[in-house]
């Protein structure tokens, strides 16, 4: 479990949020490794010995640029956003793709199994809901804390199948800025091993009504060694599309 240092400046909203996750409150930073810091109105991920931190902020930086200047055209095609599909993001992480999908007007159910990452994402969504420019988009994201492969079958029984299951399993980041590389290094160190790819893809294909969309590096291997039905390829990223079991290609 992840340590969290709660500063005296932490707001009541932040204190309430972090109680929803199995984190270990500490009175001082650990001697090594990563930990969460709750201060003022934000939860951040820190690495002992480093000055920089990681927060989920949908109101500025790259998220703001993609929201105001466009972006996400390839992912929009991959999920066929003009059909207004429901999307379950089974590997939400820090929520970037969930936010892009929600900014396209889609309703997104996001799953994150790591308590610290889920806490960071929940905090980012909470703050986005308070910003007039992002509140409508953030309201379309429903975060579930837990393992998607375990939770999706039960959720299907109560909500029905989603049109799309979206997967973005961890892979080595290449040709990224120094800041992005450092952020991903923090993230990978915190999360450790990725989910079982075979189980994840199998469950996704059982769950999706129309398609499973998998984000990969342009030259990366197929997820779980399984070839997709078709692909959407960009300069550095591609989206592999798998059909649900029993579906015809098309």
UniProtKB/Swiss-Prot annotation:
GO cellular component annotations, sorted alphabetically?
cytoplasm
InterPro entries named in the record: 16SrRNA_methylTrfase_J, SAM-dependent_MTases_sf
Q: EC class of this enzyme?
A: transferase
Protein origin, superkingdom: Bacteria
Q: Name one GO molecular function term.
A: rRNA (guanine-N2-)-methyltransferase activity
Q: Where in the cell is it found?
A: Cytoplasm
Q: For this UniProt record, give its keywords in alphabetical order, as a comma-separated list.
A: Cytoplasm, Methyltransferase, rRNA processing, S-adenosyl-L-methionine, Transferase
Determine if Amino-acid biosynthesis is one of this entry's keywords: no
Pfam families noted in UniProt: SAM_MT (PF04445)
Under Enzyme Commission nomenclature, its number is: 2.1.1.242
Q: Which residues bind S-adenosyl-L-methionine?
A: 96-97, 168
State the family it belongs to. Answer: Belongs to the methyltransferase superfamily. RsmJ family.
Tell me, what does this protein do in biology?
Specifically methylates the guanosine in position 1516 of 16S rRNA.
| Name this protein carries in UniProt | Ribosomal RNA small subunit methyltransferase J
């Amino acid at each position: 479990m992840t340590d969290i240092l709660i500063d005296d400046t932490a707001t009541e909203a932040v204190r309430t949020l972090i109680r929803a996750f199995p984190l270990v409150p500490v009175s001082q930073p650990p001697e090594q490794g990563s930990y969460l810091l709750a201060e003022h109105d934000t939860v951040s991920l820190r690495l002992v010995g480093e000055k920089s931190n990681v927060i989920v902020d949908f109101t500025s930086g790259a998220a703001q640029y993609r929201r105001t200047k466009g972006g996400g055209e390839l992912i929009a095609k991959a999920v066929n956003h003009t059909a207004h599909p429901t999307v379950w993001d089974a590997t939400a992480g820090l929520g970037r793709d969930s936010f892009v999908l929600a900014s396209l007007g889609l309703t997104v159910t996001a799953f994150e199994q790591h308590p610290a990452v889920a806490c960071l994402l929940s905090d980012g969504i909470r703050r986005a809901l308070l910003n007039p420019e992002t509140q409508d988009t953030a309201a379309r994201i429903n975060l579930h804390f837990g393992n998607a492969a375990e939770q999706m079958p039960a959720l299907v029984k109560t909500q029905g199948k989603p049109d799309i299951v979206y997967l973005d399993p961890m892979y080595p980041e290449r040709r990224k800025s120094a800041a992005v590389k450092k952020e991903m290094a923090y993230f990978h160190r915190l999360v450790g091993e990725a989910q079982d790819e075979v189980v994840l893809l199998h469950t996704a294909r059982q769950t999706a009504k129309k398609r499973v969309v998998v984000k990969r590096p342009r030259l990366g291997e197929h997820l779980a060694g399984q070839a997709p039905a078709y692909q959407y390829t960009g300069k550095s990223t591609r989206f592999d599309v798998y059909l649900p079991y029993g579906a015809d290609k098309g």
